[in-house]
């Protein structure tokens, strides 16, 4: 069994040296379904969900089942863990350039303050350290 929270030195996708990790591969399919359900209790309706590779792909697939398909609803971009927000913003910019429409974002865990357009299910304390 893999631990969800791991005390380990590693380099994040953003290139930061971190001392603990949230290992989302530890979650079971039922836990991912529950996370999607929790997000839907707080989300505005969205047209479709798109997961950021690699961490957001499964969540995007599950949340896409809740998509309305309505052109007047935003597209939902999702990821598992947000550290700096760089991946979310970059994915948004690329998608918006190809498909200029309204977008919302959801992440399961946020290690820092997310961009204004991104919602967080579980927010870690924000510090200036």
How should each PLM-predicted stretch be described?
Residues 1-129:
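PRPP-associated nucleotide enzymes
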